Amino acid sequence: MKNIVLIGFMGTGKTAVGRRLAGRLKREFIDTDAEIEKVTGKTVAQIFARDGQIRFRSEEALLVRKLAGKENLVISTGGGMVLNPENVRLLKENGVLIALTADPEVICRRVKNKKNRPLLMRGDLRENIKALLKEREGVYDVAEHKVDTGSMSLDQAVENIIHFLKEHNYIE
């Protein structure tokens, strides 16, 4: 069975939804940021600070190549994973992409106390979020389905995804 790949901006709930969805579907859950941290022995913030965004994106690309050959996973990606068209191609080869969305205010509320968001660390948080969202406009349109996690509970988001997957014969 195809992988279920959650994409979307940081703070949209990919990890929380992914964990719950994997539990409901009895599938293995993979959080790409956590996997990269495990492989490198550094946090995402440390990789960005010490090695730069380019190094982090190359770690993402290596991981995607590894995951593309697997099945029955629920994969939660980093917010910028889909900036690389090759990542998108590989993830779509054996996966269905689901984009999680939320408005800037919801994202701001969710990430404001987290120190592991290197792209938001400088300047005004709300303005950084709005600028990055504008910069990434359309990037998440590669998904087969979108879920606004800002307008529903975690369980409602999971149910929405399961309904979509059943309706389109990705799961039984």
Curated annotation (Swiss-Prot):
Cofactor: Mg(2+)
Keywords, alphabetical: Amino-acid biosynthesis, Aromatic amino acid biosynthesis, ATP-binding, Cytoplasm, Kinase, Magnesium, Metal-binding, Nucleotide-binding, Transferase
Domain of life: Bacteria
Compartments (UniProt record): Cytoplasm
Protein family: Belongs to the shikimate kinase family.
NCBIfam families: PRK13947.1
Record's subunit section: Monomer.
Name of the protein described by the UniProt record: Shikimate kinase
Gene name of this polypeptide: aroK
